[in-house]
Amino acid sequence: DKKYDTPIFKEVNPNFISRFTKRLINNPTKRLLVGITGESASGKSTICQEIKKTIEHLNMPISVLSTDNYFNDISELIKKYGCFDTLRDNGYDIDAPESFQLQLLRSDLLTLASGKNIMAPRYIPNGTGVSVPRALDVNSQKIIVVEGIATMYEEVRDVFDVKVYIETENDIRKERFLKRAVTERNQNEENAIKQWE
């Protein structure tokens, strides 16, 4: 696409498009699950939204789900330590597999793949660590795009038909990460820099 300085996809297997199209056309009940992952602030959500716009422009039904909503509720831990930054400084790794509700994520993905809708949790990324159970209504559409670090964890990665890894230059990621940490996640810049490093 001309509006991007660098290509979105470095390489696409030539047989992929053919297999992808045949799978959707030949099996009307089949759901296609696409997992998009990459390091923090690599552009997973942005790419996901671009895919959604493109698919909707083609008048095809699509659902989008973020694995960030499957973070464990850590509100009590944050209260205990006073704030998220102190909790992290004491060894809590928000990107570790144990920080996610992976069994629930797997179950929800399999339910979507079977053609049934789900009520997904909603994690509130404002520094409180609150996760609200069954808060988001997600429809099982023909194409289901799931983005987030957790998509490629061992517990769930086999559920996806297509897996995409987003690779972004480190300086771009750092700038995005710091901006998001301060403006969206209620962190101060000093602690956000510490978390990045």
Predicted feature residues:
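Small-molecule kinase domains that catalyze NTP-dependent phosphoryl transfer to phosphate-bearing small molecules
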Residues: D1, Y153, T183-E197
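Post-Walker A helix-loop "phosphate-sensing" segment adjacent to the P-loop in P-loop NTPases
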Residues: K53-S63
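Active-site signature of alpha/beta-hydrolase-fold catalytic machinery across serine-
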Residues: E50
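Conserved nucleotide-sensing/catalytic segment adjacent to the nucleotide-binding pocket
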Residues: S63-S66, Y70-P125
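Extreme N-terminal, non-catalytic leader segments
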Residues: D1-G35, S40
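ATP-dependent NMP and nucleoside kinases share a basic, alpha-helical "lid"
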Residues: S131-T183
